[in-house]
Amino acid sequence: DISNFIEAAKTFHVLGIKITKDGDLINEWYSEPECRRNIYSATKSFTSCAVGFAVQEGLLSLDEKLTDAFPEDLPDVIDDNLKMATVRDLLTMCLGQERGSLMGEQRPLYQEDDWVKLSLAIPFQYKPGTHFVYNNVGPYLAGILVQRRSGCDLVSYLTPRLFEHLGIKRPTWETDPLGNSFGAGGLFL
């Protein structure tokens, strides 16, 4: 019986407890079983998984140039660093942009609804792969590419491939102004 342990855990605002032994579930308890929690930037790990599945399924390549992946979304003037950027660079935080964009406090301030075009229009100051900058642009664009190639949002794409296998039921995902899953954050599990 774990009731005393649960009562003690409640005083620390523990959200859930799972007890396993030799790989078998012995007991579990959740403070709010149907409540979803925002996992914020840990969302990026799930977007990376989506990219991995898409690569495995032949929907995209890590070496694909962004100029080939997003031909309709490119700025009028394409600098040399953007021409070199690949899907792989989207996942490494070394995209080549000088500062982080699409960050939480910035998103409500954007006048532009098309964040793909906005993201690609931000100058690529550095050669991709040479400067680390924590940035939501890479994971966001990676998620967009998976959605475009798979024909569905990230929840629909990841549910049969990952979420069902992990026992994650009914995840939700924040979207950009055009309704695309925001691959850099806002996944609720």
Give short role names for the model-derived ranges:
Residues 10-11, 81-85, 110-112, 125:
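Extracellular/periplasmic catalytic domains that process cell-envelope and extracellular macromolecules
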Residues 2-33:
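A short, well-structured edge-of-sheet supersecondary motif
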Residues 23, 38-63, 90, 142-146:
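Active-site SXXK
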Residues 25-35, 120-128:
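Glycine/charged-rich beta-loop-alpha catalytic/anionic-binding loops adjacent to active sites
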Residues 57-97, 121, 150-185:
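Active-site helix/loop module of the DD-peptidase/beta-lactamase fold
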Residues 35, 39, 78-80, 127-134, ...:
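Solvent-exposed loop and edge beta-strand segments that line ligand/cofactor-binding
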